[in-house]
Regions:
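Signature of the first transmembrane helix
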Residues: 6-63, 161, 220-245, 299-300, ...
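Membrane-water interface segments that mark the loop-to-transmembrane alpha-helix transition
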Residues: 9-21, 47, 52, 56, ...
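Transmembrane helical elements of multi-pass membrane transporters/channels
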Residues: 10-25, 149, 155-160, 177-197, ...
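Small-residue hotspots at the loop-to-helix junctions and early N-terminal turns
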Residues: 41-45, 49, 245-256, 323-327, ...
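Helix-loop junctions and terminal segments of transmembrane helices
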Residues: 59-77, 258-281, 343-349
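Interfacial segments at transmembrane-helix termini and the short loops linking adjacent helices
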Residues: 109-125, 306-337, 379, 383
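Membrane-interface junctions at transmembrane-helix termini in multi-pass inner-membrane proteins
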Residues: 119, 129-152, 278, 333-361
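Hydrophobic alpha-helical transmembrane segments
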Residues: 126, 150-199, 255, 362-366, ...
Length: 413
């Protein structure tokens, strides 16, 4: 299949995957915001935000590092044993991360009141995250058979979605939500096991040394993936320490809407990443940028304009106070897209992972320092947190744009 056709196919299935990833929460959102009290929905949003952070931790950049390694092995038609060893070591490394993640959850539950008060709900939610280790998304991405991953995800979420609609009617049934996620994840793991058998893949004895080395390799990818989630997670966690569950609900809803949009647009970068690994073409990345950034800018403006009416339809009148927060945070849509494009598909493929990591760490520290400064001086408000989120994304953009211009001569023409 020609490269362009493969890119289109990969991008189509990744976009469909992300559409489903965004659609299911949006479909369930108007139901839960109307059935649950604002306070309980705030608790739900807070726990979900923490779980999104932990999901990135458990993934630890393997969606890029392991995908890249498997794609190279597959392209070179290397020894199948080497292929299976990478899969096994990656799985073992992620299990270690999953166990460490459990320790992190328990520590957070001790110090964060919302998590402590919803302990069983928090632990059940994390177990659903832990089960994602066994879905092998990195494998299907590396083999460029993304349709398997997408179809499985849609089936899994459909089951969870339908169960939630029928059985979650009021506040005291909140625990059902992660239990349904666990049930659907188990079904998905069963489907994945059948696909592994079809591919005639087998697990070999894991190497602890190789697994730890893979963690070291993936760390820089993790830091990059961590950026958008870290910005959102840090902001929400700080708000949860200071503000009421109702205010957490307003901010969490805003982050959920904007974050889902950012993730959807970010799939373009995932779609072109394998091709950029092969070509390292400046012309190609410029073509993609010139065609997409004006559209993303127009989309961002549209979100800002139509937020009030959209929020009223989506969540109901009681969440209208969140409209101004969403309008501020919407500015990050454009810059987040540019940052994703300038990250691994651009700087990463010319072996400037260090610069991608530096930009991520620097902007994350800026975000955290700004929030803690406002907190220390008693000047923390929801709108100021949203504004800091925008400025942080702009800081990240400026750093990555500087590196792109500095190293642009290293691309192929």
């Amino acid at each position: 299949m020609p490269n362009l056709s493969q890119i289109k196919k990969n991008t189509f299935w990744l976009i469909l995957f992300q559409l489903a990833k965004m659609a299911f929460p949006f479909l369930i959102l108007p139901i839960l915001t109307r059935r649950l009290s604002v306070e309980v929905y705030g608790n739900l949003t807070y726990v979900k935000t923490v779980m999104n952070f932990l999901q990135i931790f458990v993934d630890f950049g393997f969606m890029l590092s392991a995908t890249k390694e498997l794609a190279k092995i597959n392209h070179q038609k290397s020894d199948r044993t080497k292929f299976e060893q990478v899969i096994t070591n990656t799985l073992f490394a992620r299990i270690l991360l999953g166990l460490l993640g459990l320790v992190i959850v328990l520590v957070l539950c001790i110090f964060i009141p919302i998590l402590h008060q919803n302990l069983l709900f928090t632990l059940a939610s994390y177990f659903a995250v832990f089960l994602s280790i066994f879905l092998f998304d990195f494998l299907f991405r590396g083999l460029e058979i993304i349709h398997i991953m997408t179809i499985r995800f849609i089936l899994m979420k459909t089951v969870s979605f339908l169960l939630t609609i029928f059985f979650v009617q009021q506040d005291n049934q909140l625990l059902y939500i992660p239990l349904f996620d666990i049930f659907s994840s188990v079904l998905a793991i069963i489907l994945v096991s059948f696909e592994l058998k079809k591919l005639h893949l087998h697990f070999v004895r894991p190497s602890l040394k190789a697994s730890l080395f893979s963690l070291k390799t993936s760390f820089i990818y993790f830091l990059s993936d961590f950026s958008a989630t870290a910005f959102n997670a840090i902001s929400t966690i700080v708000i949860g320490l200071v503000f009421s569950s109702t205010e957490v609900a307003f901010f969490g809803l805003s982050i959920q809407i904007i974050g889902a949009t950012q993730s959807l647009l970010g799939q373009l970068s995932s779609g072109i990443y394998p091709e950029m690994v092969r070509q390292k073409s400046l012309k190609f990345i410029n073509q993609v940028s010139q065609k997409t950034t004006p559209l993303v800018l127009l989309f961002t403006i549209a979100v800002i304009i139509f937020t009030p009416i959209g929020l009223q339809i989506l969540a109901g009148d009681k969440y209208l106070p969140a409209a101004s927060l969403i309008q501020i945070l919407a500015i990050t849509i454009f810059f987040s897209f540019c940052n994703t494009l300038l990250g691994w598909p651009t700087l990463g493929v010319i072996n400037h992972q260090k610069q991608v990591t530096i930009s991520t760490v620097a902007s994350t520290f800026f975000n955290l320092f700004s929030l803690l400064t406002l907190l220390f001086f008693g000047q923390l408000t929801l709108h100021r947190v949203a504004l800091i989120r925008v400025i942080t994304e702009l800081v990240l953009f400026c750093i990555r744009l500087y590196y792109f211009r500095k190293f642009r001569q290293e691309f192929n023409l």
